[in-house]
């Protein structure tokens, strides 16, 4: 057979090989993109009075399990849920803490000691006085602040067994500084327990 003909056949075969190979690569990548897009799940809602957005790489919808975890945090720490553990402690309906609240309060008191009170969960009366909490206020005087400070301070409370002991019944707790971040941790823990490692959890700006 003529060498020129053989050369042309070889070129055509090579071009066909390239075209088929390229088509297979494109199709494979397209399938991967489509598969990746269908494997992302998004859950949204509200907790602690603020929106949350959770996205994770899984076809398994974990929203129900996440809601259970967030509800537990809400029932322990929410200032805006009158049935929460912290709300009942603030209103002196009870002095008994559930394990979750006790654990977080113990950690909070440790941080308060290390920061010399820069972080303090007993600021609820001040927060309310300034209108940033669950009560509204138009203005606050220095005299009011001085009066409130008489029962604000981490040294005004202590943990005795499963109970919270207050030196003054007007002392109230506010976990707003850590509640959302703790909620993020609990939602993330649900995902990781189910083998999901690619995710983003955002609650009220905390991630």
Regions found by a protein language model. Name each.
Residues 2-179, 189-200:
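A contiguous, well-ordered beta/alpha segment that forms the leading edge of an enzyme domain
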Residues 200-207:
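FAD-binding core of FAD-dependent oxidoreductases
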